[in-house]
């Protein structure tokens, strides 16, 4: 019987390594796919590990710039903070992973793709809805969700099948990381009353360990895209990585969040997003300088919906594509420089400038240079307040009657 091919999203961890053996038992040839999203892993080692465990082919693809420009950039421009806190670190990477799974599956003639998600997380939804959107004819296999083993049973299976067991298996934490940040759950973090231990963090320093002197960074934007730090041009991925180091040193971007998952439960997550939080803050300030009031007041409505769509795994939905078009239109004049102070866990905007600035000092000033037409205020107030005045007159008559 000829074996079918399956493309597996491979991380190098225990779950996806065991999944290779498990899929072999189901008569599949496994093609492993590992993406470099900027998490800092030794991906060459991961690629070789997949082959040693039993994959017939192993891909390692650097997608850092694609992730930065096609995914993180939109999140920054839409100021996506789920429930006001979470910058969608993992949620942003899942549609890109799904896209590459489908591309490799079609290239290799595979009939199925597989992922290592459990049956109680958001990621299974994000992967599978994205895959259905891109190629509804591919079978999707979720080994971890199907086998329902305990951790002990999984380790026993790994030992029986000569699957290498990671040396960090005793770590209580479940970690996911990419350019946009780092998420951490499980272990003591499952108690929402417990303070996160310092070893739960990696990208940021504790406040007591941060410098006692602030650091200033000037971020340059072109049509809504961050392009420079302190006058030096970077690719977007490199800019994000550089800013992660700068802001992380000052403790910026630590987030402790009890969030409402798509699957109906609450979970406690600890995030580190130094660059994401700094860029979102700076970008919002530049928009405040360059957007007319109507756009500035309406855009948050769109931002909220975009955030929900991405969190819920609907990156490739028609509505998200339509809202993205609106978002892109709003970025045309978001060009300028923002000065940010990094200090003791805060990214504080202290200055902003733009050739498209709608701030007119001659209209705003209260000095002798004031050019605002004060006399025009009388007629404006009369017309603006007319509906309220008429309503009050009508209702007062009824009360008097």
UniProtKB/Swiss-Prot annotation:
L-citrulline binds at residues 86, 122, 126, 174, 183, 259, 271. The keyword Ligase applies. ATP binds at residues 9-17, 116. It is found in: Cytoplasm. Its EC number is 6.3.4.5. It comes from the Bacteria. Homotetramer. This is Argininosuccinate synthase. It comes from Bacillus cereus (strain ATCC 14579 / DSM 31 / CCUG 7414 / JCM 2152 / NBRC 15305 / NCIMB 9373 / NCTC 2599 / NRRL B-3711).
């Amino acid at each position: 019987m000829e074996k079918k091919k399956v493309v597996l999203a491979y991380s190098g961890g225990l779950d996806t390594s065991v999944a290779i053996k498990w899929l072999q038992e189901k008569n599949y040839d496994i093609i492993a796919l590992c993406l470099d999203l900027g998490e800092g892993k030794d991906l060459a080692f991961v690629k070789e590990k997949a082959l040693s465990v039993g994959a017939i082919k192993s891909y390692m693809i650097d997608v850092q710039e694609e992730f930065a420009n096609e995914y993180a950039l939109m999140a920054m421009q839409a100021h996506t903070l789920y429930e006001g806190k979470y910058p969608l670190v993992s949620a942003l990477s899942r549609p890109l992973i799904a896209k590459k799974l489908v591309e490799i599956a079609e290239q290799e003639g595979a009939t199925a793709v597989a992922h290592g998600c459990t049956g109680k997380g958001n990621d299974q939804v994000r992967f599978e809805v994205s895959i259905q959107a891109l190629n509804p004819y591919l079978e999707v296999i979720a080994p971890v969700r199907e086998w329902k083993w305990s951790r002990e049973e999984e380790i026993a299976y790994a030992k029986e099948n000569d699957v290498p067991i990671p040396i960090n298996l005793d770590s209580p934490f479940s970690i996911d990381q990419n350019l946009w940040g780092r998420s951490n759950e499980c272990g003591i973090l499952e108690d929402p009353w417990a303070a996160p231990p310092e070893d739960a963090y990696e990208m940021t320093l504790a406040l007591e360990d941060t410098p006692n002197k602030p650091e200033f960074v000037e971020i340059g934007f072109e049509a809504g895209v961050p392009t420079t730090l302190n006058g030096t041009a970077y690719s977007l991925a490199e800019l994000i990585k550089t800013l992660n180091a700068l802001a992380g040193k000052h403790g910026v971007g630590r987030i402790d969040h009890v969030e409402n998952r798509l699957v109906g439960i609450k979970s406690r997550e600890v995030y580190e997003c130094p660059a994401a939080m700094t860029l979102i803050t700076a970008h919002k300030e530049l928009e405040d300088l360059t957007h007319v009031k109507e756009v500035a007041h309406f855009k948050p409505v769109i931002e909220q919906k975009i955030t929900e769509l991405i969190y819920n795994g609907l990156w490739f939905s028609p509505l998200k594509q339509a809202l993205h078009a609106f978002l892109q239109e709003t970025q045309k004049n978001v060009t300028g420089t923002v000065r940010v102070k990094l200090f003791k866990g805060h990214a504080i905007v202290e200055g902003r400038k733009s050739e498209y600035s709608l701030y007119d000092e001659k209209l705003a000033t209260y000095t002798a240079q004031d050019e605002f037409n004060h006399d025009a205020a009388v007629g404006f107030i009369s017309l603006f307040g007319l509906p309220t005045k008429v309503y009050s007159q009508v209702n007062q008559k009824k009360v008097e009657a």
